[in-house]
C-alpha cells in the first residue's frame, strides 16, 4: 500500500543458522527500502543470510513472474582459496536439512504482509535441492 516515494522501510526478519541447531532462534531484523523491487528485496535477504549463516558463500537470485525465486548456491572461485564450500560444509548429510530450512524460511518470509514470493527453488550444480 506504500505508494509515497518517501524513504519508508520495511522490516524483514532473518533467522540465524547457528541458533537453528540449538533450537534457539536468534532473529535479526533487516531494514529495506519499501519502494525497492521484489528482486532487490530478495537479494538483500539472500546477501544477509549468506554473510550471517553461510560464510559469505555466493548465491544467485532470479525471480520468475512475481512469485517464484530460483536461488543458485554457488561455490567460491577456486582461485580465491577459500576453505569453505556449500558441498562440504552446508550440504553434507548432517546439516543439509538445517541449511535448506534456514534458506527456505528466510527467503519465503511467510509472516511478511507485503508482496513477496510464494515459492523458492534452490539449486546446487544444476540440481534442484529438496528436504528428503
Please tell me what each predicted stretch does.
Residues 1-132:
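Bimodal "functional hotspot" detector
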Amino acid at each position: 500500500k506504500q505508494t509515497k516515494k518517501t524513504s519508508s522501510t520495511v522490516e524483514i526478519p532473518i533467522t540465524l543458522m547457528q541458533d537453528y541447531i540449538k533450537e534457539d532462534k536468534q532473529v535479526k531484523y533487516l531494514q529495506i527500502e519499501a519502494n525497492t523491487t521484489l528482486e532487490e528485496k530478495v537479494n538483500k535477504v539472500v546477501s544477509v543470510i549468506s554473510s550471517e549463516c553461510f560464510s559469505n558463500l555466493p548465491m544467485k537470485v532470479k525471480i520468475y513472474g512475481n512469485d517464484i525465486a530460483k536461488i543458485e548456491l554457488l561455490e567460491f572461485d577456486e582461485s580465491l582459496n577459500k576453505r569453505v564450500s556449500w558441498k562440504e560444509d552446508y550440504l553434507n548429510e548432517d546439516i543439509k536439512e538445517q541449511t535448506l530450512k534456514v534458506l527456505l524460511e528466510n527467503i519465503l518470509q511467510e509472516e511478511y504482509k507485503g508482496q513477496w514470493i510464494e515459492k523458492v527453488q534452490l539449486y546446487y550444480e544444476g540440481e534442484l535441492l529438496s528436504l528428503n
